[in-house]
Amino acid sequence: MTKDVINNMSTHMDKTIDALRKEYQRVRTGRASTGLLDEIKVDFYGTPSPINQVATLAVPEPRTITLQPWDAKMIPVIEKAIMNANLGLTPANDGKVIRLNIPPLTEERRKDIVKQLKKLAEDAKVAVRNIRRDAIDELKKQEKDKKISEDDLKRAEKEVQDVTNSHVAKIDEVFVHKEKEVMEV
């Protein structure tokens, strides 16, 4: 009974960490990453499509992203979508390939990005703690309904706290790694 609650809680916490990592991919760090373009939709013959479904994305150099549309007529549409996404990137094309040069970040901008990353990490920690609270509430309900003993409840609460602590540590680890990447010149 308690194992199910703890496994379910752990799965939800893992999803929270995955969501944080995905969110961090979208943050511009001064280094090229195709993750910057994940949320951009392009009008592909009347259908809004993710940019990676209308072009091949590549990172040939640390500060350059290239997009090679499968249909050359899509170049202006893709460029417009990138401009409208307000990423601070200006596309340049040679008729076949679109190039996005990632400008280096200023020290002030790096610090702002780190603040943004810290807030995202704190939000993830709050989500993990809410998941912990829900799990403990479920365990207390089971104890009240006499499905588990008081000793089982105490043991399970300790295990819930241990799992929570390990997930909070993972969030800190993800944050520190991304912070290093952003502050690297």
Curated annotation (Swiss-Prot):
Gene3D superfamilies: 3.30.1360.40, Ribosome-recycling factor (1.10.132.20). It is found in: Cytoplasm. CDD domains: RRF. It comes from the Bacteria. InterPro entries: Ribosome_recyc_fac (IPR002661), Ribosome_recyc_fac_dom (IPR023584), RRF_sf (IPR036191). The keyword Cytoplasm applies. One of its GO terms (biological process) is cytoplasmic translational termination. One of its GO terms (cellular component) is cytosol. Keywords: Cytoplasm, Protein biosynthesis. Pfam families: RRF. PANTHER family: MITOCHONDRIAL RIBOSOME RECYCLING FACTOR PSEUDO 1 (PTHR20982:SF3), RIBOSOME RECYCLING FACTOR (PTHR20982). Responsible for the release of ribosomes from messenger RNA at the termination of protein biosynthesis. May increase the efficiency of translation by recycling ribosomes from one round of translation to another. This is Ribosome-recycling factor. The gene is frr.
